[in-house]
Regions:
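Conserved PLP-binding active-site segment of the aspartate aminotransferase-like
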Residues: 375-381, 413, 417-421
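C-terminal substrate-recognition/cap domain of FAD-linked oxidoreductases
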Residues: 188-190, 196, 201-392, 400
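Activity-critical C-terminal alpha-helical subdomain
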Residues: 415-451
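Short acidic/histidine-rich active-site segments
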Residues: 403-410, 445-448
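FAD-binding subdomain of flavoenzyme oxidoreductases
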Residues: 71-75, 83, 87-88, 92-235
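N-terminal flexible segment immediately upstream of the FAD-binding catalytic core
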Residues: 1-41, 45-78, 128, 201-204, ...
Length: 451
């Protein structure tokens, strides 16, 4: 059995399974699930393995890989996509038809089924929202073998109840239950625990004429955060943040980063023409913000914008290199807070991180959504210290009205955080939905809820 089916990008160790199935049809999956249900055999669904919370890692039982569900048909305004299709292939196919698929999770090698299962986001979610917003139809195989073909707006046939949800733009912490919700919003973000998503129809948009891209450098963090507040309503589709430690790491590969830069914002803005007045408006905004305008980087070509995106995506690689060389252990967060608490939360993060792990962290990410990631370089001999701090930060995020999981899902690694977010009765409501759709608890055992 290939180790590929026993692990994902989370690094969660100990994955093992008795059998791996690679079906080609919904009816094959239905038969496998009926057999598993009869034997109470746990089943883990395998996408591309890019998830970072361990949902795909099996601990016994069977694995169903969706790699052969690779149908991809692009039509005006939508695409029909098998669960095993990779995100980059959907993007490429849409581009060939002068269209684009707005969701853009960082890992373009992720599968569409996995993106829907964890309701993935990305940098463009600032303007376009998470994956679920773009799903118009789903095919799902339930644990009892029933095959559902579900359209957007089709209400579920039972009342799941309603749980209080945070006032944030992104949230993937458990099942986001509300009375009258539709099936698509129930399955999107359920992380393979309620059914097997095999195919989707997703909306596409006409490709913009051009896109302005920029990496804007600032002399201080305060200047960058002032710019975030000023630019949020200016219509960018991307508004990303890098702190001073992030820039220090990135200088290893990009020595042309200005020496006086202590923060950076990555922006993209769609243009209606090559002479769009938005170009001049952005020049004025950047100068008014006191940015290092002459030293910042700008582009309107796709190749240069891709270079900027790779610049941002170099950071996780450099973090991993740093952790490996130092013999440390990386821990990270996926918390988000309401927009009004963005600056306050960031200051509180820094205060606690400097007190406990001075100089051993970076903060970067989706500042436009008040959703930044902390990567913490902790001592592998004392993981509890780092875990306790991250849980403290999670409690603070919830206290501020936020979420403990904005885009990565809960998986198996972060099940302990749901009790920080929700009261026992709200977790009980989620478990009731799980029992309704998967009474034998065969799907994704240990994901979302501890085993």
């Amino acid at each position: 059995m290939s180790l590929h089916y026993l692990e994902d990008a989370s690094g969660l160790p100990g994955g093992h399974a008795e059998r791996v199935f690679v079906p080609e049809s919904d009816t094959e999956i239905a038969g496998i699930l009926r057999q598993a249900g009869a034997n109470a055999t746990p089943v883990t669904i395998a996408g591309a393995g890019t998830g970072v919370t361990g949902a795909r890692v099996p601990f016994g039982g069977w694995v169903i890989s969706l790699e052969k569900f690779n149908r991809l048909e692009v039509h005006p305004g939508n695409a029909v996509v098998g669960a095993g299709v990779l995100l980059r292939d959907l993007h490429s196919a849409a581009t060939r038809g002068n269209q684009f698929y707005p969701p853009d999770p960082t890992e373009t090698g992720s599968s569409i089924g996995g993106n829907i299962a964890c309701n993935a986001s990305g940098s463009r979610s600032f303007r376009y929202g998470p994956t679920a917003r773009w799903v118009e139809r789903l095919r799902v195989v339930l644990a009892d073998g029933r095959i559902l073909d579900l359209g957007r707006g089709e209400p579920i046939d039972f009342d799941p109840g309603t749980i209080p949800l945070p006032n944030v733009t992104k949230n993937t912490a458990g099942y986001l239950l509300r009375s009258g919700m539709d099936w698509i919003d129930l399955f999107a973000g359920s992380e393979g625990t309620l059914g097997v998503i095999t195919e989707a129809t997703v909306r596409l948009l006409p490709a913009p004429v051009s896109v302005l891209g920029g990496v804007v450098f600032f002399r201080s963090d305060d200047d960058a955060l002032d710019a975030v507040e000023a630019w949020r309503d200016a219509g960018p589709r991307i508004l990303e943040y890098l702190d001073a430690p992030s820039l220090a790491l990135l200088r290893q590969r990009h020595p042309d980063i200005p020496g006086e830069a202590r923060a950076a914002l990555l922006i993209e803005h769609e243009l209606e023409s090559e002479e769009d007045p938005a170009l001049d408006a952005w020049i004025e905004r950047i100068e008014a913000a006191g940015a290092l305008a002459e030293a910042s980087w700008f582009a309107t070509t796709a190749s240069d914008r891709e270079r900027f995106r790779k610049f941002r995506h170099n950071l996780p690689e450099l973090v991993n290199d740093t952790v490996r060389r130092a013999g440390a252990m990386k821990m990270n967060t996926d918390y988000a807070v309401p927009l009004a608490r963005n600056r306050e939360m960031l200051a509180w993060y820094r205060q606690r991180l400097e007190a406990e792990f001075p100089g051993r962290y970076v903060i970067f990410g989706h500042i436009g959504d008040a959703h930044v990631h902390i990567n913490l370089f902790s001592d592998p001999a004392d993981p509890e210290r780092a875990m306790n701090l991250l849980k403290e930060l999670a409690r603070k995020a919830v206290e501020f009205g936020g979420t403990v999981s904005a885009e990565h899902g809960v998986g198996k690694r972060k099940t302990h955080l749901l009790e920080v977010q929700y009261a026992p009765e709200h977790l009980a409501a989620m478990r009731a939905v799980k029992r309704r759709l998967d009474p034998a608890n065969i799907l994704g055992r240990g994901t979302v809820f501890p085993s």
